[in-house]
């Protein structure tokens, strides 16, 4: 084995030299130079500095403006709440541990940080699944006259939380475990060992299949059918130009969110899968650290995409920041009236 396994950790370095120590008790500067740990701390500070204001602002503006409280926006706000969980439950912890060079909060702190990081990522993924299904049902119309209403949105939010908990909670109760990963300053699911006493192998397979592959398959199925339907509708002029434009803009925004999610999380999932399927292989701490920390940037992109691509929200945000007045004088009257076929109650205004 090219790593050192302890009771609650796995350090990606052989202990033949005798330098490996518990990441809960000693600085891990034998894994990487101290400046690299400082760089990780600075990176996490940047994510906190950007992630908290932009997510909190998105949440606050939506609460302040009643016209933004549409059913589809409930799902988008669910993404924001997931991001805030990651910022408070994960980023602050990881920044402090990186500053110290090891996981100073101990095993319990590792479980808490790993839980919030996993929960936030899974809520985001399952929220994107709900958005994809909503877009598919609304645009492709497999069920005629379906209207995505408030009850559907609430069920979608509840579903995303149930599925996320089904992924993040089992390690807390003995099915798999959370351990430090990479440079040992952040925690995640144990992909490094089979650990038969906690049935780790079965959990990792369950997680990859149920909480990664299946959601992505649903998303790709929905958008694959959706793209074909939009092209066909445009060719046959089945909907009004305004309706087609609104549906395309909403769909484009959600697709960009999906692409951003894949960019952030697929490298991490790929590396984790490689490590799991190549037990004992030789890899350095940086190999897992870079994709793990890159995945954390996902807490920023959803609200940014929402702000950039939603003109109605931008106007509301400017009005809120300017104490009730929009200096640009660009109140989007059409945004509040955007008509999307069979789904006027779930509208998200186009940019």
UniProtKB/Swiss-Prot annotation:
Disulphide bridges: 110-187
UniProt GO MF annotations: 11-cis retinal binding; G protein-coupled photoreceptor activity; G-protein alpha-subunit binding; protein homodimerization activity
Post-translational modification: Contains one covalently linked retinal chromophore. Upon light absorption, the covalently bound 11-cis-retinal is converted to all-trans-retinal. After hydrolysis of the Schiff base and release of the covalently bound all-trans-retinal, active rhodopsin is regenerated by binding of a fresh molecule of 11-cis-retinal.
Protein family per UniProt: Belongs to the G-protein coupled receptor 1 family. Opsin subfamily.
Pfam family, one: Rhodopsin_N
Membrane-crossing segments per the record: 37-61, 74-96, 111-133, 153-173, 203-224, 253-274, 287-308
Function: Photoreceptor required for image-forming vision at low light intensity. Required for photoreceptor cell viability after birth. Light-induced isomerization of 11-cis to all-trans retinal triggers a conformational change that activates signaling via G-proteins. Subsequent receptor phosphorylation mediates displacement of the bound G-protein alpha subunit by arrestin and terminates signaling.
Name this protein carries in UniProt: Rhodopsin
Coiled-coil boundaries: none
Extracellular side: 1-36, 97-110, 174-202, 275-286
Cell compartment(s), UniProt: Membrane; Cell projection, Cilium, Photoreceptor outer segment
Motif ('Ionic lock' involved in activated form stabilization): 134-136
Sites marked Plays an important role in the conformation switch to the active conformation: 113
Residue numbers bearing the Phosphoserine modification: 341
Ranges of the Cytoplasmic topological domain: 62-73, 134-152, 225-252, 309-351
Superkingdom of source: Eukaryota
Ranges where the record places region Disordered: 331-351
Glycan attachment residues as annotated in the record: 2, 15
Biased composition (Low complexity): 340-351
Keywords noted in UniProt: Cell projection, Chromophore, Disulfide bond, G-protein coupled receptor, Glycoprotein, Lipoprotein, Membrane, Palmitate, Phosphoprotein, Photoreceptor protein, Receptor, Retinal protein, Sensory transduction, Transducer, Transmembrane, Transmembrane helix, Vision
Any one of the GO BP annotations: protein homotrimerization
Positions where lipid (S-palmitoyl cysteine) attaches: 322-323
GO cellular component terms listed in the entry, alphabetical order: membrane; photoreceptor disc membrane; photoreceptor outer segment; plasma membrane
Its membrane topology: Multi-pass membrane protein
């Amino acid at each position: 084995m090219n790593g050192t396994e302890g009771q609650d950790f796995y350090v990606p370095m052989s202990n033949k030299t005798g330098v490996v120590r518990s990441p809960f008790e000693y600085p891990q500067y034998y894994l990487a130079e101290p400046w690299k740990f400082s760089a990780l701390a600075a990176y996490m500070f940047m994510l906190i500095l950007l992630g908290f204001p932009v997510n909190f602002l998105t949440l606050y503006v939506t609460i302040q403006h009643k016209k933004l409280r549409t059913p589809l926006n409930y799902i988008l706000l669910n993404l924001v709440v997931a991001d805030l969980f990651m910022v408070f439950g994960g980023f602050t912890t990881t920044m402090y541990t990186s500053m110290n060079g090891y996981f100073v909060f101990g095993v319990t702190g590792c479980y808490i940080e790993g839980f919030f990081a996993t929960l936030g990522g899974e809520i985001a993924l399952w929220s994107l699944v709900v958005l994809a299904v909503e877009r598919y049902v609304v645009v492709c119309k497999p069920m005629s006259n379906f209207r995505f209403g408030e009850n559907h949105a609430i069920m979608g939010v509840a579903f995303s939380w149930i599925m996320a908990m089904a992924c993040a909670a089992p390690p807390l109760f003995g099915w798999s475990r959370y351990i430090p990963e990479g440079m040992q300053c952040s925690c995640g699911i144990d992909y490094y060992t089979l650990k038969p006493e906690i049935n780790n192998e079965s959990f990792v397979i369950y997680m990859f299949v149920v909480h990664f592959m299946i959601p992505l398959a649903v998303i790709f199925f929905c958008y694959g059918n959706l793209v074909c339907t939009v092209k066909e509708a445009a060719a046959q002029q089945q909907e009004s130009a305004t309706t087609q434009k609104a549906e395309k803009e909403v769909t484009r925004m959600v697709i960009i969110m999906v692409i951003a999610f894949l960019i952030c999380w697929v490298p991490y999932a790929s590396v984790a899968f490689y490590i799991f399927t190549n037990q004992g292989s030789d890899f350095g701490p940086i190999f897992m650290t870079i994709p793990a920390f890159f995945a954390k940037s996902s807490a920023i992109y959803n609200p940014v995409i929402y702000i950039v691509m939603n003109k109605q929200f931008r106007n509301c945000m400017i009005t809120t920041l300017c104490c009730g007045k929009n200096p640009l004088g660009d109140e989007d009257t059409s945004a509040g009236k955007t008509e999307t076929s069979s789904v006027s109650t779930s509208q998200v205004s186009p940019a």
